Amino acid sequence: MMIAGIDEAGKGPVIGPMCIGGVKIDESKAHILKVLGVADSKKLTPKKREQLASQIKKHADGYFIFEVSPSQIDELRKIMSMNEIMVVCFAKVLEQLKPDIVYADAADVKAERFAENLLRQYAKTSPDHAKKIKVVSMHQADAIYPVVSAASIIAKVRRDELIEELKREWCIDFGSGYPSDPKTRGFLLKWGKEHGGDFPDIVRQSWQTVENIREELKKS
């Protein structure tokens, strides 16, 4: 029986893409993930995540990372909520893996609702398989199911790679990209002042952080 885990990295940042990772592995060898020391990606150092990502890809029966750019997120937010965006993105990963059982980290306050919505979305493109697949969604699934931890790790490593690429491309260290990061906020304030409140396409324009900074700049 094939099981899969799906998780995201970068849902909350104001800068950079979001990555949704999926890992598929035969249930009979899923214990390998525990042996590797797979754990919640947030609790691992970047170096350890990179090492594990390489091992995960080697042992997995399939994996896929779906990348969503800041501008794509902004466009989607015009017609749907962030929770709905997560459902669509998770379904994209599911389409690539087609396991017998999928464990998904719930991107909704109601985990069961997220599972139902994910299955409904998946059925739009894979109606036959949607009748057979079992969808399990839980909060903090990455801390419960090693296969979800594995998905979280490959997603986080890929997002970190993309963030470093952006820093090199723009020759700017904007920090982690999270609104709570002083370096990120400092970059946004400085850029906003220098460019009349306009921001580059690496920034999620629909984020409240950006709106707040624009309001601050108007007052000053």
UniProtKB/Swiss-Prot annotation:
Gene3D superfamilies, sorted: Ribonuclease H-like superfamily/Ribonuclease H (3.30.420.10), Ribonuclease hii. Domain 2 (1.10.10.460)
Reaction catalysed by this enzyme: Endonucleolytic cleavage to 5'-phosphomonoester
Cross-referenced Pfam families: RNase_HII
Superkingdom of origin organism: Archaea
GO biological process, one term: DNA replication, removal of RNA primer
Cofactor: Mn(2+); Mg(2+)
Domain RNase H type-2, residue spans: 1-219
Record GO terms (molecular function): manganese ion binding; RNA binding; RNA-DNA hybrid ribonuclease activity
Keyword Glycoprotein belongs to the record: no
Subcellular location: Cytoplasm
Cellular compartments per GO CC: cytoplasm; ribonuclease H2 complex
EC numbers for this chain: 3.1.26.4
Keywords: Cytoplasm, Endonuclease, Hydrolase, Manganese, Metal-binding, Nuclease
Cofactor binding note from Swiss-Prot or TrEMBL: Manganese or magnesium. Binds 1 divalent metal ion per monomer in the absence of substrate. May bind a second metal ion after substrate binding.
Entry binding sites for a divalent metal cation: 7-8, 105
Similarity-based family: Belongs to the RNase HII family.
Known role: Endonuclease that specifically degrades the RNA of RNA-DNA hybrids.
NCBIfam families: ribonuclease HII
The protein's name in its UniProt record: Ribonuclease HII
Source organism of this protein record: Methanosarcina mazei (strain ATCC BAA-159 / DSM 3647 / Goe1 / Go1 / JCM 11833 / OCM 88)
